[in-house]
Amino acid sequence: MTDQSNIKDANVYDEHGNPMNREYDLGRDGAFIGYRILIGQFYTSGDMSAPIEALKMKGFHVDNVKNEFEFISKLRFNDYQIAWVISASSIESPKFVSTLIDFHSAGGAIFLFADNIPYICHASEFLYEKFSIILTGNYPGNKTLRFRENGHLNAGYFGQHEIFTGIKNLFEGVTICHPVYLKPKNQTSMITVATATDGNPCIALFDPPSDSTEGRLCLDCGFTKLFINWDSPGTARFVLNVSCWLAKANK
């Protein structure tokens, strides 16, 4: 399955209009054996068991750590293809951002999660150093985004992209932030693919050119979907689709 949000021939749909069954995910179950994900869960209050089990169904090996020093050590000395970063309100290690930049520059892919202020720090500091982008905001969203081809810049919509395969309706998050581009030219680096119901970007992607050594990157601005809203419209499939896309593997 690739690049198909509006699937019309599924046998069963959920209450939100999204096709049920994992065959409509971007990646097949078991197809990602050998791919390793390191999760830096710096916002430690949430239960990550559901996302981790879902990733394992796709074949990913997943390690979840809750402090920066262990995250830095593992990212430097273990063979991970993807890093998840779930932001907290402050950064402890002065080496965190540089380590993440080195990982990304060498081809590592990153899934950045932020939420309302102050839970933006890890993602925002990385984005500032890498792209001159900061995160801000505390929008009480709690609504559902809808698919519209080429509608990604319209409030309340997401557009056509592989990461939205099998998703017609997608929960935006509860209290969410948004990116601010400090240099206008960098608006072409991180591409908005979904816009929250307040009109601000809420999901953005970086897909490096073919001659670049950098990895792919996704920013999601409402991370409570990983914890208390895992069963919200489209969430589980979206998180899995992004992880498969980050692996640069359509399997």
What are these regions (language model features)?
Residues S49, E53, S98-I101, E125, ...:
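Solvent-exposed, polar/charged alpha-helical surfaces in well-ordered, non-transmembrane soluble domains
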Residues K56-F60, I101-A109, Y128-S132, A247-K248:
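Sec-exported extracytoplasmic/periplasmic mature domains
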Residues F32, M57-G59, S105, Q187, ...:
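Short, well-ordered coil/turn elements that cap or connect secondary structure elements
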